[in-house]
Amino acid sequence: MLIYIHGFNSSPESYKVSLLKTFANKINMPDVLEVPALSFDPAIAMQQLLTLVHKYQTQQGMRPLCFIGSSLGGFYATWLAEKFDSRVVLINPAVKPYELFEDYLGYNRNIYTGQEYMLTMDHIDQLKKFKVDEITHPDRYLLMLQTGDEVLDYNQALEKYAAVPSIVEEGGGHGFTDFDRHMETVLAFCGVNCLKAYS
């Protein structure tokens, strides 16, 4: 099972999610991907994710679980990967989102859902609780970066995940331009046998 964790002010309707869903359907595995619609509130968002993981483990036992996190979702995915000893793909991940949130304090609106909400210092404090100081199993990570990220400094991720296998592309942007070129790489890393699925 793959759990995709979207970024701040994003949703399950994002571009990368649509590409992943299309590819999963193409290889006849539409149920391999879960994409929860997460709350803007970090504590609630993490509880949503933990509930989903617990549900999956209850239903599927110890079958492999892989997280795919984009931007803020990469920050959450890192914490979850360490907690559950899971594989994880990080796409232009936020390393210090609690610092970035300071620019968004106050009124915000989700461009996908239209939801309006207030971001407070309490939310920043919540985020800090999910900070991971040490990556214990770098081989379980795949880092994907584009140097043209206009939102995050990709060098922070290079430093944070220095020991992690990585794909670093020149140019691009925060949304990871031409992400569709990496579908098979991402799913294969997560343990999905694309060739078998095609047959």
Tell me what each language-model feature is.
Residues 2, 63-66, 141:
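Generic beta-sheet signal
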Residues 87-199:
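The alpha/beta-hydrolase serine catalytic core
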Residues 68-77:
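Gly/Ala-rich beta-loop-alpha elbow adjacent to hydrolase catalytic centers
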Residues 4-8, 68, 144-146:
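Short hydrophobic segments within beta-strands
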Residues 79-83:
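Active-site signature of alpha/beta-hydrolase-fold catalytic machinery across serine-
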